[in-house]
UniProtKB/Swiss-Prot annotation:
Native organism: Vaccinia virus (strain Western Reserve)
Family, as annotated: Belongs to the DEAD box helicase family. DEAH subfamily.
Catalytic activity, reaction form: ATP + H2O = ADP + phosphate + H(+)
EC number: 3.6.4.13
Record-level GO cellular component terms: virion component
GO molecular function terms attached to this record: ATP binding; ATP hydrolysis activity; RNA binding; RNA helicase activity
Protein name: RNA helicase NPH-II
EC primary class: hydrolase
């Protein structure tokens, strides 16, 4: 469907687009093209104003029940009006008088082509649209946006590139075409903060109709923005809630979905046309109940995110529109061209608002000498922070590979630098409190972080990035540190230059960068289980295909050996984390055990019942050797004796030396097997 967005339906960015009510005199002075723009108002008016409305007679004049109170009456016969009263907004016949809006209400019936609308219908649609506050203009003021979506406060002023008229037209044309859309944008253009809001607006106006060429029945469904982490769900939903003029969730178009969500973050009066911010896992549970699907952070290749893309592509007729948003297409453009059916690529150009200077600090040690490389890196980092120091009251972010390195580098820096030091990563619970300290401190703050800060939280006062160029890539029963990809570098660099000029200091040779194929270092059971649930053909229906297909087929055989029906697996997928696939054998035993095991997965509380149940699975690990690490830690070199990765080597830390065997309770809890 080729449709251009008329100017009168732009979302009010409160910079050069404002909410506006048009007068009948203005309509009279418009060109035919401008007048015809109002024909599209029939769709939001039918949904939000005329749904369940009827004709009444009010003070002798026929009106719509949404205009005035009155007794329900049979509609009058309509021919060409004898007279038009622009001031009273009424059509006058010899026997009766009818409001502009009521005339349009009676004329706009199912299957009517919108290009057949005459001036009389368009004038009524103008009045109905004014009542809904759906129109916009290049003149106005912020306060005119109060009430547009039921909001008590005005929309935020947004000068970002994604809400310019040009970008709005391009995004609308892609959305209404029903083609899959891949959207990229420069740093700070508002991909995540504004594009979902724009798609919410389009959904409010036109969502649910199969065509915008004629009047049809509609099936209203919300938009969903699917995100890889709870922190992102909370951050972006709050940003958009406030920018739309709301202070509370209830009754707003914003809803949140993630596991163990607190009561106060549940919208008890959601809008059918609204937008749901959800973690990937919960998005999958009701994927086809949404009209527009937005998948963010595609470049991260979160496992469930990649599965959503595969499912949406397989069942694209069940979704009206799909948007994939990514920081960069460096690694994925060619695959997306082949994988998606006739995709549209949209790039919103934009650079950081302020200049970013780059500084390279050379490490003279080869990375193959891991410990020596890291020691040299830490020395270089101290020198770099001394030479390139954030101003007082500002902050710098040090990107390291892992949580353990956060603590290692913080301890090292604290002994050598006089600045405030903080750690932020995905497992830190009091991030808001830490940021309050960072923002209120008159001193320099240095934040040591994992890749979590690439996108999860925006630090307002950051001026410097110190990038070690590493990421920890988890693997079954282990993992490894790898150099980052270009997309990760771009994300890290883009943390500065938004509010002030920034400096990006990097400590790695650019030739070390490489694409990271995460699927080759993941447990693959989710791909099997969701493929069964959504009838995907493996491996060709997967967005990213594993390099070693033998592991995929071994995983399938292992899952089949559990002797659990597809229907039961689907229930387990919808209700439980199953951080270890073997837990499925316990979830099906009894509701009481399932409840306690679920609580363990969510909170870490290990009851004796759950402990004994997991031990009964005999998830055994053989200890090959050990060595002393420090006062209370021993490194054990082991071999996995169960599951798909039977025979895989693993390294496990324990507070005393062990021999023989241990049983696995979770990825962090191990129980020695009694040798007696």
């Amino acid at each position: 469907m080729e449709k251009n967005l008329p100017d009168i339906f732009f979302f009010p960015n409160c910079v050069n687009v404002f909410s506006y009510k048009y007068s009948q005199d203005e309509f009279s002075n418009m060109s035919k093209t401008e007048r015809d723009s109002f024909s599209l108002a029939v769709f939001p008016v039918i949904k939000h104003r005329w749904h369940n409305a009827h004709v009444v007679k009010h003070k002798g004049i026929y009106k719509v029940s949404t205009e005035a109170r009155g007794k329900k009456v049979s509609p009058p016969s309509l021919g060409k009006p004898a007279h038009i009263n622009l001031t009273a907004k009424q059509y006058i016949y010899s026997e009766h008088t009818i409001s502009f809006e009521c005339y349009s209400f009676l004329k706009c019936i199912t299957n009517t082509e919108i290009n057949s609308f005459d001036e009389y219908i368009l004038r009524g649609l103008l009045e109905a649209g004014n009542s809904l506050q759906i129109f916009s203009n290049s003149v106005g003021k912020r306060t005119d946006t109060i009430g547009v979506l039921g909001n008590k406060y005005p929309f935020s002023k947004i000068p970002l590139a994604s809400l310019t008229p040009k970008a709005q037209r391009e995004i609308f044309s892609a959305w209404i075409s029903h083609r899959p859309v891949v959207l990229t944008g420069g740093t700070g253009v508002g991909k995540t903060s504004q594009v979902p809001k724009l798609l919410l607006w389009f959904n409010y106006l036109f969502g649910g109709f199969s065509t915008l060429d004629k009047i049809t029945n509609f099936h209203e469904r919300p938009v969903i923005l699917s995100l890889p982490r709870i922190a992102l769900v909370r951050l972006h939903s709050n940003t958009i809630l406030k920018s739309l003029g709301f202070k509370v969730l209830d009754g707003s178009p914003i809803s949140l979905r993630y596991g163990s969500i607190p009561e106060e973050l549940i919208n008890k009066q959601p809008k059918k046309y609204g937008i749901v911010f959800s973690t990937h896992k919960l998005s999958l549970t009701k994927l086809f109940s949404y009209g527009t699907l937005i998948i963010d952070e595609v470049h991260e290749h979160d496992q469930i995110g990649d599965i959503i893309i595969a499912v949406a592509r397989k069942h694209h007729t069940k979704i009206d529109s799909m948007f994939l948003m990514t920081a960069t297409l460096e690694d994925d453009r060619e695959r997306l061209k082949v994988f998606l059916p006739n995709p549209a690529f949209i790039h919103i150009p934009g650079d950081t608002l302020f200049k970013i200077s780059e500084v390279f600090i050379h490490n003279k040690i080869n990375p193959s000498s891991r410990m020596a490389y890291i020691e040299e890196e830490k020395r270089n980092l101290v020198t770099a922070i001394q030479m390139y120091t954030p101003p007082d009251g500002s902050s710098g972010i040090v990107f390291v590979a892992s949580v353990a390195q956060c603590h290692e580098y913080k301890s090292y820096l604290e002994k050598r630098l006089p600045y405030d030091m903080y750690i932020i990563h995905g497992k830190v619970l009091d991030i808001d409190e830490i940021l309050e300290k960072v923002y209120s401190s008159p001193n320099v703050s240095i934040i040591i972080s994992t890749p979590y800060l690439e996108s999860s939280v925006t630090i307002r006062n950051v001026t410097h990035i110190y990038d070690m160029g590493k990421v920890f890539v988890p693997a079954p029963f282990g993992g490894s540190q790898e150099f980052i990809s270009k997309s990760m570098r771009d994300q890290r660099k883009g943390r500065v230059g938004r509010v002030n000029p920034g400096t990006y200091v990097y400590f790695y040779d650019l030739s070390y960068m490489k694409s990271i194929q995460r699927i080759d270092s993941e447990f693959l059971h989710n791909y099997i289980l969701y493929a069964n649930k959504f009838n995907l053909t493996l491996p060709e229906d997967l967005f990213i295909i594993p390099t070693n297909l033998d592991i995929l087929w071994r995983t399938k055989e292992y899952i089949d050996s559990f002797d659990i029906s597809t229907e039961t697996w689907n229930k387990l997928l919808s209700n439980y984390y199953m951080k270890m696939i073997e837990y499925a054998k316990l979830y099906v035993l009894s509701p009481i055990l399932a409840e306690e095991l679920d609580n363990f997965e969510r909170t870490g509380e290990l009851t004796s019942i759950v402990r004994e149940a997991i031990l009964s699975l005999n998830l055994r690990i053989k200890i090959l050797n050990f060595k002393h690490k420090d006062d209370d830690t021993y490194i054990h070199f082991c071999k996995i004796l169960f599951g798909v990765y039977n025979g895989t080597n693993a390294t496990i830390y324990y507070h005393r030396p062990l021999t023989g065997y241990m049983n696995m309770i979770s990825d962090t809890i191990f129980v020695p097997v009694d040798n007696n």
